[in-house]
Curated annotation (Swiss-Prot):
It comes from Mycobacterium tuberculosis (strain ATCC 25618 / H37Rv). It comes from the Bacteria. Part of the Sec protein translocase complex. Interacts with the SecYEG preprotein conducting channel. SecDF uses the proton motive force (PMF) to complete protein translocation after the ATP-dependent function of SecA. The keyword Transmembrane applies. The chain crosses the membrane at residues 67-87, 187-207, 218-238, 243-263, 301-321, 331-351. SUPFAM superfamilies: Multidrug efflux transporter AcrB transmembrane domain. PANTHER family: PROTEIN TRANSLOCASE SUBUNIT SECF, PROTEIN-EXPORT MEMBRANE PROTEIN SEC. The gene is secF. This is Protein translocase subunit SecF. Gene3D superfamilies: Multidrug efflux transporter AcrB transmembrane domain (1.20.1640.10). Residues 402-432 have a biased composition (Low complexity). Residues 433-442 have a biased composition (Basic residues).
Length: 442
């Protein structure tokens, strides 16, 4: 009888252990596929709701050939525009003369007419800088000789009679300055040096903090942003000024920041990916994109708001062309940087990583497990030796749970020592502990 009771207790303990293992495996599998299950359950939710919660299951990495084609077409158009159309360089790069005087009630059309009658040619630009009593008229033209400058000043004084600081009409109120074309070249040279130093520091940091494949992807994405932004300027015909060059450098920081946000999530999702066969590396990277999608959009929107405010102040209130050029290149760069961090940098990272032996072997194992229909951990148990087996489905889990709920109490009744995994059994005595000190003493 004792041997039979012992055998019964062993059977009950074994079933309880199997229940615990199956339950943990089912929970692990449920957690591993939470994004897919959530996306299927939230199918009736709106697009914005799924986008905000990160459960949209938008396929980005799986369609990376499409995004590579779109990105390649954009770069091709940008390069073709740069080569065949070229840039519209401002006076700081081509050299020229700037003439300015207090506005008063002067209109731009009147200034252009006086300039044409005085010199027989059109000015490059006539803008009104500032507002109110401090507003000035700024004329930019090709390089003028001393005689041409004096003739233009006389014509402007006769036509508009600008007033000096004492409130009386004076020729001294009209100022002129010449800009050498070498100054813009010096600014560009220094900007290129700063760009190279920036790229080197970025490459070192990402390589040390993450990995070399992320470095290659991030640097390529930044070059993509620079090329497309420059192509937009060439295609639309925006004037290139030193402020434009400075703006190109500022958008690199935003582009890198947005890219690193996604890369950090990719690293978190793919940490130890080779020890599991639930998802491939590409699927984990796509999950990271979905989880950071809304964050990238919110970051871009917050970055665009001050840029738009700067453009409004520069164009409608102050009329400062330098601020307009700076804000314009930043606006274009932020939009392109957001696109590249989601649809270009991460798909490129996945493409580079899939060329490695580790990722290729892991992808084959995942696909083999899915095709065979075996549990997620059966193959890992023999190859990696550390992963728990997953339950086949929820119905089997429910059946095991019901069986255990009946067997666990019997095991507890047959022995004072509870079996592993069995439910706790309350004491049978009539008097329960009160929790008070010295309660049982008389």
């Amino acid at each position: 009888m004792a041997s039979k009771a012992k055998t019964g207790r062993d059977d009950e303990a074994t079933s309880a252990v199997e229940l615990t293992e199956a339950t943990e495996s089912a929970v692990a599998r449920t957690d591993g596929d939470s994004t897919t299950d959530t996306a299927s359950k939230l199918g009736h939710h709106s697009f914005l709701s799924r986008l905000y919660t990160g459960t949209g299951a938008f396929e980005v990495v799986g369609r990376r050939r499409l995004w590579f084609g779109v990105s390649g077409a954009i770069v091709a158009v940008a390069i073709a525009s740069i080569v065949f159309r070229g840039f519209t360089f401002g006076i700081d790069f081509k050299g020229g003369t700037t003439v300015s005087f207090p506005r008063g009630s002067t209109q731009v059309a009147q200034v252009e007419d006086v300039y044409y009658r005085a010199l027989g040619s059109e000015p490059q630009s006539v803008v009104i800088v500032g507002a109110g009593a401090s507003a000035t008229v700024q004329i930019r033209s090709e390089t003028l000789t001393s005689d041409q400058t004096a003739k233009l000043r006389d014509a402007l004084f006769e036509a508009f009679g600008p007033k000096g600081t004492d409130g009386q009409p004076s020729k001294q109120a009209i100022s002129d300055s010449a800009v050498s074309e070498t100054w813009g070249g010096q600014i560009t040279k220094k900007a290129v040096i700063a760009l190279v130093v920036f790229l080197v520091l970025v490459a070192l940091y990402i390589t040390v903090r993450y990995e070399r494949y992320m470095t290659i992807s991030a640097i390529t994405a930044m070059l993509f942003d620079l090329t497309v932004t420059a192509g937009v300027y060439s295609l639309v015909g925006f004037e290139v000024t030193p402020a434009t060059v400075i703006g190109l450098l500022t958008i690199l920081g935003f582009s890198l920041y947005d890219t690193v946000i996604v890369f950090d999530k990719v690293e978190e999702n793919t940490h130890g990916f080779q020890h599991t066969t639930r998802r491939t590396f590409a699927e984990q990277a796509n999950l990271a994109i979905n989880q950071t999608f809304m964050r990238s959009i919110n970051t871009s929107l917050i970055g665009v708001l001050p840029v738009l405010a700067l453009m409004v102040v520069a164009v409608w209130l102050l009329g400062v062309g330098t601020l307009k050029d700076l804000a314009l290149v930043q606006l274009i760069g932020i939009i392109i940087g957001t696109y590249s961090s989601i649809f270009f940098a991460t798909p490129l990272l996945v493409t580079l990583r899939e060329r490695t032996e580790l990722v290729r072997n892991h992808t084959r194992r995942v696909l083999k497990r899915r095709n065979s229909g075996s549990p997620a951990g059966s193959e890992d148990a023999s190859t990696d030796g550390g992963e728990q087996p997953a339950a086949a489905d929820e119905q089997s889990l429910v059946g095991i749970t019901q069986a255990s709920s009946q067997s666990a109490p019997r095991a507890a009744q047959g022995s004072s020592k509870p079996a592993p995994g069995a439910r706790p059994v309350r004491p049978v005595g009539t008097r329960r502990p009160t929790g008070k000190r010295n309660a049982g003493r008389r």
